[in-house]
Amino acid sequence: PGGAPCNVLALLQKMGRKTAFIGKVGNDGFGNQLKGALEETGISAEGLFMDGDVHTTLAIVQTKSDGDRDFSFYRRPGADMMLTEEQIPEELIRNSRIFHYGTLSMTDEPVRSATRKAIAAAEEAGLVLSFDPNLRPPLWNTLEEAREQIHYGLAHCHILKISDDEITWLTNEEDYGKAAAAIRAQFPQIRLLLVSLGKEGSLAYYNDMEVCVKPFLHPDTIETTGAGDTFMGSILHKVLEKGLDDLK
């Protein structure tokens, strides 16, 4: 079970960090399964709400012959979309060190406004904000709307993790170094920018450094869904350990 922010939390929890999830699922079999997964993993479900009127959102992932993935969603509406501003646990946010978010909670109201309230609470409390756009085109009315919401996310984060396809689409630049430079120039509060390259590894841009890391390939790999979230969780674990001022 996921989705992306929960996958990040699961990695952090396994690394010994204290984590909590904010979101909404349906009061149905899938929702109860997800709540149970949180509790089993050790992630706090204090910010998890159960909706008796709307079902839990489902994502179906199909692996294609070339190894790429195709996502299908049952979400019109889904319970995750129904989280409201009033349900945001501001005290929980204030007592945290990092707030991690994506754009799946920005596709529709009321969860879009709820996400913005959570971001504002995190900023007011002085947290490090971490953002992974995790673009899923089928969930958006238009890609232009997606671009607008991604720009909102970029304007508020200190750490950005973005995929190779996403950064090329967002900047219209195929050179990752130039694309990263363009984003950092427009959003100068971003301290650490990470580009995941799939089987090619990853790139990191920090201060004036560019770091290229080769992939950890395994011949028996079956499924890569969640690999980027595991990567993100590992990065946040290191940020919690060292801070953003001295990652060298």
Regions found by a protein language model. Give the residues of each.
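Short phosphate-binding/catalytic loops that engage adenosine nucleotides
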Residues: 17, 43, 127, 188
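Alpha-helix C-terminal capping segments
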Residues: 7-18, 63, 238-241
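Short, conserved phosphate/pyrophosphate- and ester-handling motifs at nucleotide-, phospho-/glycolipid
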Residues: 12, 163, 228
